[in-house]
Design a protein with these regions (language model features):
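A structural signal for multi-pass alpha-helical bundles of membrane permease subunits
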Residues: 1-198
């Protein structure tokens, strides 16, 4: 999910930051306005769409949302970072014979690495600890995510074994902590320089 989110958000951000097309400002305004919508408003339309597609009780809803850049915060963050990169880089790449996609891959992606790591880490954190969306889209116990499985251990009708709950909580937090320490250089740089580079 994290990889799909970073790739789709980068492609959409590149389009907004570097190209002029009809309705660009309106589309960007729509993107920004979706940032203001709480998840509770979006959950019912998404649920009906995924129900009609027949992908409920699976992990496909999470993949589909990330493939189609349904997380506007990351797109906005990457747009701001890309706007801070000099356009002369694109022009010099064009003079050297690079096409649009090659310019993105060879020239801009290495410079976008801090912002992409930040977006990836945020997405991993939010997806890994997501309880509400998992509860809505997944029904089978065998497909439960860690957050849903952790909730199962807190059954009020039986005695709660706190040592199991604490052990499972540590397991739930461990991947995020490890990932943060591995990528903290890029994460801090991406947050500090988003929209200021150039």
């Amino acid at each position: 999910v994290t990889l799909f989110t970073v790739v789709s958000s980068t492609l959409v951000a590149y389009g907004f930051a570097r190209f002029e097309f009809r309705g660009k400002k309106i589309f960007f305004l729509i993107l920004l306005s979706t940032l203001m919508l709480p998840n509770a408003i979006l959950i019912i339309p998404r649920y009906t769409i995924f129900r009609d597609l027949g992908v409920l009780d699976s992990y496909y809803p999470f993949y589909l949302m990330s493939v189609f850049a349904c997380y506007p915060f990351f797109t906005y963050m990457l747009v701001q970072f890309t706007r801070g990169l000099p356009r002369e880089l694109d022009e010099s790449a064009c003079m050297d014979g690079c096409g649009t996609f090659r310019t993105l891959i060879s020239i801009l992606l290495p410079l976008l690495k801090p912002a992409m790591f930040s977006a990836g880490l945020f997405q991993f954190l939010w997806t890994d600890n997501d309880y509400f969306n998992s509860l809505i889209y997944i029904n089978s116990v065998k497909k439960f995510t860690i957050s849903l499985a952790l909730r199962l251990t807190l059954d009020s009708e039986t005695v709660i074994t706190w040592k199991n709950v604490m052990a499972m909580s540590c397991l739930a937090v461990l991947p995020v902590v490890i990932l943060f320490f591995l990528c903290q250089k890029y994460f801090v740089e991406g947050i500090a320089t988003t929209g200021l580079k150039g």
